[in-house]
Amino acid sequence: MEEEICAALAAKGITHPFPIQALTLPVALKGQDIIGQAKTGTGKTLGFGIPLLMDTLGPGEEGWDEDPAAGSPQGLVVLPTRELAKQVAEELSTAAANRTVRIVQVYGGRAYEPQIEALEKGAEVVVGTPGRLIDLMDRRVLDLTHVTTVVLDEADEMLDLGFLPDVEKILARTRTDRQTMLFSATMPGAVVSLARRYMTQPTHIRAQDPGDEGMTVKTVQQVVYRTHALNKVEVLSRILQARGRGRTIIFARTKRTAARVAEDLGARGFATGALHGDLGQGAREQALRAFRNGKVDVLVATETWQIGRASCRERV
């Protein structure tokens, strides 16, 4: 690994690789395509982020002046949600702290102008959601013809959200000799089919026990409480009163339920925030900041936002 990346990670206390990173890095650094099957929280971002950054040149770095594609995106990371895009971009920026590589986030729910301006100034790595990436390509602001590394993260979620056709459009606009890394917690048929069409002899890496089919890592303790729908808030209140529970995320199936539960818990005296699709992007980011900063310690969210991935890494 490059000294600059190692030093940047060491400054954040990252000195040893997680299992998915130890498995991924030797293969990815050879430029091979990878299908990584790993759950959330296993550290896969640096598993693909470090090879991506090492294959990218920033302004003023050795070889930059001779690169005919200087200033154009060389790396692309596609994710299903804004929150995940922000999280991954922040992790890549941490690893690239001692480099001049410019990392630009593009996602919906925000004005086009700042994102267009950032791309026009030059971006070596673009991290974004499928819809906004396609919009910017259609506006001829985003050129992916020089991208050498593509990462498809949380591919099964992109399938669930109906984004795979958009992902195929994006891949079709990149060069055929690119390196492609696909990561997914599960491998439904549509994701496998996508990999077969757009990847070249990929190495399959599985960072979990073959017999472990659960969606969560083994360190997550799971408990089921059976209760009548009318008593759910009361039961939640009693659970939340547990001593030393720390910050808590409650997932709800619908936007209406998330809003109602947050309101009911707030009325019972809990510092509660809500996060769902009826809120604007600014309101969602404000709710996440409040949760990270401890202003609220209970966050009620719809399942599609997957806040456990994007909010914080401390105890939840």
Predicted feature descriptions by range:
Residues M1-R315:
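Conserved helicase RecA-like core
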